[in-house]
Amino acid sequence: MMSVQKANTVSRQKATGAHFTPDKLAEVIAKRILDYFKGEKNRVIRVLDPACGDGELLLAINKVAQSMNIQLELIGVDFDIDAINIANERLSRSGHKNFRLINKDFLEMVSEGDNYDLFNIEELEPVDIIIANPPYVRTQILGAEKAQKLREKFNLKGRVDLYQAFLVAMTQQLKSNGIIGVITSNRYLTTKGGGSTRKFLVSNFNILEIMDLGDSKFFEAAVLPAIFFGEKKNKEYQKENSNVPKFFKIYEQSDIEASSSVNSEFNSLIELLEVNKSGLYSVEDKTYSISLGKIISPENYKEPWILATEDEYEWFMKVNQNAYGFIEDFAHVKVGIKTTADSVFIRSDWGELPEEQIPEDKLLRPIISADQANKWSVSLVGNNKKVLYTHEIRDGQIKAINLEEFPRAKNYLESHKERLASRKYVLKANRNWYEIWVPHDPSLWDKPKIIFPDTSPEPKFFYEDKGSVVDGNCYWIIPKKENSNDILFLIMGICNSKFMSKYHDIAFQNKLYAGRRRYLTQYVNKYPIPDPESIYSKEIISLVRELVNNKKETQDINEIENRIEKLILRAFDIESLKY
């Protein structure tokens, strides 16, 4: 049973985003930062941690600085007085005298009004170094009012996470040519929504290195962490940045093949952060994949950064150069429906309801969810899950059904009216209280489509032509009007291949815990496709049709999949999956 103390800590972490940094990881960050100050032994370097918690990062950088004979002035800020008291006690015990702790909310120390980027200089002077693990709190936990205030105060765009406000505030508090080392979520590296953060970092920093810690679990956190190291640009004197930004990426590998190809073994996870060669490494009974290389930052900030080794980047570029197009050129990729009240609209026990509440057959449609996903095809035998679908095409437009025409559905929905009508966003959008929030075009469900789950450790793209609705934890692909259904079989062959998994990992680097990939519209849209009319593509289409339409033994499936892999390599004129 969770103790009261631990329960309070967990609750506080969720509300504030506070996750304390392990001492060894803190020392790794400190060492990387101070390497840029090796020659600075005749002056005092001012260091700030704007969310210092119990002082771990300040203690770590002080310890490393002592070993390098560098003098520091330490400044810590935190709104939690208990954390400040602990930090004060720990720093005092360390013997370091030149430190100052401030019990305030760092973000509240920013001046109001147009000069949002200016701090009260008397209270907190600009610093040479910022070392930080700022809180990560997403919009839905922050609340709309708080998020809007941060958006206005720090000139933030799109969905607001608390660490973004910290990035802006920290940047303004850092001297020109100062160094920052900050732990954040790794989402901004590869997601469309991270575009504004990428733009901000490129505009304000010479990027030195990014460490993507992936699912390695160096510390307890709700998100996958990354560490950003940058030198603040001097706006008055723009020097040429000769450094090629470096990256370090570590993810756990769970497959058996990986564990048999280990380069060397280590005693602790933290030792892996000092590895200087890409490869597979083991710690106890776990295997980790480490990649070192350079950061490719496209001119368009909306495009994700690519963290690739030289060989990976060369392979990736060759695939793109030899591609005929991308999935978005041939098909539409859509997310599934969003009911925002699944337990009301989606059930497997409709027949067990009172007869007067069992919705009319016309409104109950089979629905496919992520837990049913499989490669190539799925069987709907025994699947009783159906969705009460509240929309139809009327007068050529998508309209909510008229409940008066469906008395049993009306009875059922009215029995849940209190919950459904409490969805204020539905009513605010001038929609009916009983509607599914995102229904999509009802006329498209009967068309052939590819369905795939939003997260999965391996690709699970499968064919569906029985009129099923797609649940919100899945995506679906339908061909554009000018393309035949053949394109679906080519797309499916490409998407389910090891070839495309390799491409996905290089281009999007978005693995979650336990090696699960995220398959979002913005990623799948950018999957390369070979010439659909080539002999290799036509053979891929034929083999995928065979897998979809004929039940086969595992050995036969594996043989066909291997043939598809070879055909894909030929279609893209690539020699192998290896670099």
Swiss-Prot record:
The keyword Cell membrane does not apply. PANTHER family: DNA METHYLTRANSFERASE A (PTHR33841:SF1), DNA METHYLTRANSFERASE YEEA-RELATED (PTHR33841). The gene is bseCIM. Its EC number is 2.1.1.72. Belongs to the N(4)/N(6)-methyltransferase family. Disulfide bonds: none annotated. Keywords: DNA-binding, Methyltransferase, Restriction system, S-adenosyl-L-methionine, Transferase. CDD domains: AdoMet_MTases. This is Type II methyltransferase M.BseCI. The keyword Methyltransferase applies. SUPFAM superfamilies: S-adenosyl-L-methionine-dependent methyltransferases. It comes from Geobacillus stearothermophilus (Bacillus stearothermophilus). Pfam families: Eco57I, TaqI_C. It catalyses: a 2'-deoxyadenosine in DNA + S-adenosyl-L-methionine = an N(6)-methyl-2'-deoxyadenosine in DNA + S-adenosyl-L-homocysteine + H(+). GO terms for biological process: DNA restriction-modification system; methylation. GO terms for molecular function: DNA binding; site-specific DNA-methyltransferase (adenine-specific) activity. InterPro entries: DNA_methylase_N6_adenine_CS, MethylTrfase_TaqI-like_dom, N4_N6_ade-DNA_methylase, SAM-dependent_MTases_sf, TaqI_C.
